[in-house]
């Protein structure tokens, strides 16, 4: 299936969650028992599905991201994209990899110095709290980085809710049990 404006348009095979721009139901799935609202408001918008991609090594992930981000820039040249990571070391790894791939309009964000210009900004999830981007890519969402703990669930919630249009999730190795459970729940019929 090919969708305009998403990473599927370049041939990635993905696992799709039931909804894209996170609606209260999807937010509840991500938060689990930590949901703060007893009755979340109804969502008034829908969007492309959440896309989850698993890789065997970081190099393959970076190469695929570079290809997908180049395609996205051609289709939506004014889009703002945040590549959000669990920590500074992962941010540096992905930033260097995308620099080597010669991705245009790429910026490394430190100390919340976001430009909000079209292009790709790489930073840690914690730095993006309270901000929104057209596309958000949560990278390295593996079991080691995000174990099934309340702090991990909260951090993933912060990252996932930054996306206005679409959320992409990548993982090298074993997917976080939190995300695996959320995807499983979102794919069940009501």
Language model regions located:
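Short, compositionally biased "basic patch" segments
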Residues: 20-46
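Glycine-rich phosphate-binding "P-loop"
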Residues: 39-67
């Amino acid at each position: 299936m090919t969708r305009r404006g998403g990473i599927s348009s370049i041939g990635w095979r993905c696992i799709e969650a039931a909804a894209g721009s996170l609606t209260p139901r999807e937010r509840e799935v991500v938060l689990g028992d930590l949901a703060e609202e007893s009755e979340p408001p109804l969502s008034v918008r829908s969007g492309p599905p959440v896309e989850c991609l698993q890789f065997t090594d970081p190099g393959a992930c970076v190469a695929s991201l570079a290809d997908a981000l180049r395609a996205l820039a051609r289709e939506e040249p004014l889009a703002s994209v945040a590549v959000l990571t669990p920590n500074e070391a992962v941010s540096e790894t992905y930033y260097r990899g995308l620099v080597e791939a010669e991705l245009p309009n790429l910026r490394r964000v430190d100390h919340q110095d976001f430009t909000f210009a079209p292009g790709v900004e790489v930073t840690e999830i914690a730095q993006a709290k309270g901000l929104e981007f057209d596309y958000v890519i949560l990278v390295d969402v593996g079991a080691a980085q995000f174990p099934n703990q309340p702090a991990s669930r909260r951090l993933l919630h912060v990252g996932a809710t930054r996306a206005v249009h679409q959320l992409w999730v990548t993982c090298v190795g074993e997917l976080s049990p939190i995300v695996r459970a959320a995807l499983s729940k979102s794919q069940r019929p009501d």
